[in-house]
Every structure is written in C-alpha cells, then in structure tokens.
C-alpha cells in the first residue's frame, strides 16, 4: 500500500517534469514497466518513442543550424540523442522512483541503470503520443531538449569519439582502428560490454566498458584519441 502511494507521488512528479498530464495513467505505468516486472512491459513503446525523439531533435537542429551539412547534423544529433543524455535527463526527473522492476533488477539497483532509464524516457514519449497525439509528444520532447539544443556547440560536440579518432588517424596517415568485444557481462537485455580499440602499427590498445557495444566503443575511441594526441600531436600550420 505504501509503495503504491509512493509510486503515485513519483508519477505525479514525473508528469510535472514532462509538462504533460496523462488522461490514461495505464499508459504512463506501461512506459515505466521494465520487462523484468511484467509481461506488458515498455519495449514496444520504446520503438515508437525512439522514432518520435529522433525526428523531433532532428527538426530542432535543422531549424537551429541552417548552415550545417547532413553529416554534421547527424553527428550533432548523436551527441544529444543517446543513452547517456537520456539517462541524465531521467535522473533529473527522478524517473527511477516511478519504475516498475522485477526483484532481480531491484536488488541490482536497476532503477539507476542508464539503459533502463533511457529506455523509460523513450517509452514515455510514445505513451504521450498514444494518450494524445504525435504533435503533443513532439511538444514534450521540444520542452525537454530546448535548453540542450540551445547550448549545442557543433565544433565541440558534433564529432563522436569514433569519428574524431578516425579523422585524427587519417590526418596522420595511419590505418583505421579495430574494435573488438573482449567480454560481455550480464543478461542479454542489460549487458555490460568490454571493448578493445587497437591502433595497429602504433602499438596501442585500450579497453573501455559500456552498457551497450556502441557506448563502449565510443569510450574506447575517446581513450585512444587522448593517447594519440598526446603522443603524436599535429604540428600547427604556419600562417
């Protein structure tokens, strides 16, 4: 009984942060239900929410940065729409307090797991569209991402770690890096990946962890780039 009251309070607070009040609360509850808790979980909602999120942020960037190319806009969107940003946003909204998790996830602090929080955010965008319509869901995304888009700095954020490393190696005329899965820990839906980044002829290999293969590769690439720029800095051209 006490848990139900706390969940309702959490859901009320989450709606205030979203800037949207649900008419059908079952949709919000579904969006916050992890597969470990119930057969009616949020994974199908994530599928729709991901599309709403990507379209809306893409349109926001398209309007805000009229001079950027398609590739530049894609990289900038990747810096804003990713597990890390969504998990950070969910933490700011205390989404973890409103999640429905199975016993195993509760014991392992799943309410703080970035992948679970990020998935819940996407699922909530879908829930809003089902409760109202696409335009309302788009308004919610715009509300949440407005400040992040306003602060977006293409020069510093647009290039993800792998792209930046690739360009740095090409500028020095070295071969592209090779990424390899060294270890995968945990279950299929909530794994921790250990990825190695091998710079080949340079003789440097580093490892990094992430809640997805993509996230781990990005972290490994950033570590390799840091090493490369320290060991082989490019000479600045004389004016």
Curated annotation (Swiss-Prot):
Domain DRBM intervals: 160-230
Organism of this sequence: Neisseria gonorrhoeae (strain ATCC 700825 / FA 1090)
Enzyme class: hydrolase
Name the record gives this protein: Ribonuclease 3
BP-aspect Gene Ontology terms: mRNA processing; regulation of gene expression; rRNA processing; tRNA processing
Keyword set, alphabetical order: Cytoplasm, Endonuclease, Hydrolase, Magnesium, Metal-binding, mRNA processing, Nuclease, RNA-binding, rRNA processing, rRNA-binding, tRNA processing
Gene name linked to the record: rnc
Cofactor: Mg(2+)
Catalytic activities: Endonucleolytic cleavage to 5'-phosphomonoester
